[in-house]
Amino acid sequence: MRFLRLFGSFCLLLVAALSAAAQAQQPVLDKDYKLVTPPQKPESGKNIEVVEFFSYACPHCADFDPDLQVWLKRKPKDAEFRMVPMVFRESWKAPAKLFYTLEAMGAVEKLHRKVYDAIHKENQQLFTDQAVIDWAAKQGLDKAKFEQLYNSFGIDAKVQRAVAMGRAYGVQFTPAMAVGGRYWTGPSMVVNASGAADLPRFFQVVDQLIAMERGKPAAASAGKKKG
């Protein structure tokens, strides 16, 4: 009997400890994530929209991208991912136009990582229209078609909408990720004891925000800020 009582007490303590640990790992408002005010209407329909705000010119985005690609392979099935390039300075406009032109030509998957490497490993200055057009031609893309799309009103309009979207979401840095038009976070918000980005924990926060948007009871208290 004594053994059973001790075992029962141990189980209760274990459950309490696990519950406390789980609660401690819930994302904290204004620390691990922020609210989008006012909430924005996603473009994903029934699925939960997850947006990465990025720039090919951003070295942190280049470093973050391999971990993002790993997460994309295991992301929840009801999460629909898309990328939105930011233009925080004039030199970022050409890389933003490059992204949308690659998207229009169906070449993002093939050349996405190559753009990052060209800028951040090979020190290619892809910050002017001509530099981008010449680089694209060297990657085997039809130069005339690329240039026509790159300089089109449609691509300019997409860049303008991307900039407006970033402002509406309150995005202040890249990389950042938004969930469901209601929450946004970034690796620089989810840090370890030394102040470095905790990427495993960051993607856990993204998963939890997706769960919150989905409305799972387990995530109901996640939006409460700790006192």
Q: For each of these PLM feature ranges, what is it?
A:
Residues R2-K93, D207-G227:
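Extracytoplasmic thiol/disulfide redox context detector
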Residues F3, Q139-G227:
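C-terminal cap of thioredoxin/glutaredoxin-like
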Residues F54, M83-V84, Y116-I119, E147-Q148, ...:
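A short, structure-level motif marking secondary-structure boundaries and short turns
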Residues Y56-H60, V87-S91, D117-E122, S152-I155, ...:
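Solvent-exposed loop/turn segments at secondary-structure junctions
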Residues D65-L72, P95-F99, H112, D129, ...:
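Extracytoplasmic/secreted envelope proteins and their assembly/folding machinery
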Residues R74-M105, E109-A137:
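Structural microenvironment flanking redox-active thiols in thiol-disulfide oxidoreductases
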